[in-house]
Amino acid sequence: MTAILERRESTSLWGRFCNWITSTENRLYIGWFGVLMIPTLLTATSVFIIAFIAAPPVDIDGIREPVSGSLLYGNNIISGAIIPTSAAIGLHFYPIWEAASVDEWLYNGGPYELIVLHFLLGVACYMGREWELSFRLGMRPWIAVAYSAPVAAATAVFLIYPIGQGSFSDGMPLGISGTFNFMIVFQAEHNILMHPFHMLGVAGVFGGSLFSAMHGSLVTSSLIRETTENESANEGYRFGQEEETYNIVAAHGYFGRLIFQYASFNNSRSLHFFLAAWPVVGIWFTALGISTMAFNLNGFNFNQSVVDSQGRVINTWADIINRANLGMEVMHERNAHNFPLDLAALEVPSLNG
């Protein structure tokens, strides 16, 4: 016993720090990924709050027409946003010390880059921390794999898309209306609604919601009665109990008769894997779609694809969408260019006649 106590006392400060960082007994697990996650997310959150409240207008298009995004400059919670870094900066790394003054840094939208880069580092480390805690506890690694879907989506809109388009000014603004503006412009320029990967993402999100509601309602409807009519059904469950709290056979029988037998899972493990995999794979595909459209590999173009025997166009819904796209495109960044590329003449008229 004496020897053991002596060894503990001789443990270095660094050793004790390592043990504390990797201890699963802490109320909140830190982990080595947490060492980087905590400061980056705190920085991103702090700057976001300050900038959302008080940042001055930003020259997003690089044409000396600042756009207001903060509460103190006339916005509300819905219209407010962190305005993306100016097109004049492009993809340049733009920390505070690269600007001539803090006023210049704010005018060119420096906070957006600061927030986005710290945020992406932070959420990537959060994903690593999920894996790390799973590893320490002897669990399988699929929690971190599932979280990779929103991480991929955030990376696509905040980093990959600006890289492909050549400027952080094309990144998604950090606000409600700014997000909607990003979506509308993205549709106008890339026809995302006609991209199969976006369609898979829609199926993933809506399908995941449907399956979650179906599973929750089936389980809630087939609980094993443990309470009286005067008590909440939730009182019939005790945390850590070994026996099942619902009758999976009854749920399987109900759903199998409602649809057909093989539409219902008879294995709880495969069911829950499916519930996790469906939305995750869908969001993976959407992130991949955003990342390809970043480099202008756009959605399908079926414009004027149906003609009659005289060669006259018979409009389809694809043509209606195209008309809407053109309308959205001519209205955004209206002072940054005279007309969008889609409306430009295919050939320049010859000056020699």
From Swiss-Prot:
It is a multi-pass membrane protein. Residues 345-353 form a propeptide. GO terms for cellular component: chloroplast thylakoid membrane; photosystem II; plastid. Keywords: Acetylation, Calcium, Chlorophyll, Chloroplast, Chromophore, Electron transport, Herbicide resistance, Iron, Magnesium, Manganese, Membrane, Metal-binding, Oxidoreductase, Phosphoprotein, Photosynthesis, Photosystem II, Plastid, Thylakoid, Transmembrane, Transmembrane helix, Transport. A quinone binds at residues 215, 264-265. The keyword Ligase does not apply. One of its GO terms (molecular function) is electron transporter, transferring electrons within the cyclic electron transport pathway of photosynthesis activity. Its EC number is 1.10.3.9. The D1/D2 heterodimer binds P680, chlorophylls that are the primary electron donor of PSII, and subsequent electron acceptors. It shares a non-heme iron and each subunit binds pheophytin, quinone, additional chlorophylls, carotenoids and lipids. D1 provides most of the ligands for the Mn4-Ca-O5 cluster of the oxygen-evolving complex (OEC). There is also a Cl(-1) ion associated with D1 and D2, which is required for oxygen evolution. The PSII complex binds additional chlorophylls, carotenoids and specific lipids. The record marks 190 as: Stabilizes free radical intermediate. Pheophytin a binds at residue 126. 2 of the reaction center chlorophylls (ChlD1 and ChlD2) are entirely coordinated by water. Herbicides such as atrazine, BNT, diuron or ioxynil bind in the Q(B) binding site and block subsequent electron transfer. This is Photosystem II protein D1. It comes from Oryza sativa subsp. japonica. The gene is psbA.
